[in-house]
A protein has these predicted regions:
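Secondary-structure boundary/capping micro-motif
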Residues: 1-160
Length: 160
């Protein structure tokens, strides 16, 4: 049996197990920009494991769990604000299912004044990166070109 937050590889796609309800497992593709949780039957998972078409993988976001966040920093503030937005949603199991997710998100949008697109993005980021508060940290580590020289020798912008 798979545990919650396990990452598996199936058909060149990495999936994270989000929940294990009585019907089977709920998983999400962690590499897709527009993935949503899907329910997959436990019998199907067991058959895929038996046929060796489903393999365990290392968690690519495993370092986020223990990543230290400086107290009072902008990163901590953003993470906490994002967590406040989705906290009421992630406690409800109905948010995993397409038929009820839209209504829950619409209700939360009306409560907070946040666009639907933002809530969907934050939920997806939370689920794909390990269902921990640090999953909502900003991606500033991907910005810039560390170690690269600037291509231009002139300053950018309009000349004075």
């Amino acid at each position: 049996m798979l545990s919650i937050n396990t990452v598996v590889l199936h058909a060149d796609c990495r999936y994270r197990i989000l929940e294990a309800p009585s019907q089977g497992y709920i998983w999400i593709d962690i590499d897709s920009d527009n993935a949503f949780p899907e329910l997959i039957q436990a019998a199907v998972i067991n058959q895929l494991f038996h046929d060796e078409r489903l393999k365990l993988q290392d968690d690519p976001y495993g370092e986020l769990v223990n990543e230290p966040v400086e107290q009072g920093s902008k990163h901590q503030y953003l993470r906490d604000e994002r967590m406040k937005l989705i906290a009421p949603l992630i406690t409800q199991e109905d948010v995993y299912f397409r038929s009820t997710r839209g209504k829950l998100i619409q209700k939360r949008c009306e409560e907070t004044g946040t666009p639907k697109k933002t809530l969907y993005k934050l939920l997806r980021q939370y689920w794909q990166r390990g269902c921990v508060p640090n999953a909502l940290l900003p991606d500033y580590r991907n910005a810039g070109g560390k170690g690269k020289k600037k291509v231009s020798t002139q300053k950018l912008g309009r000349p004075r």
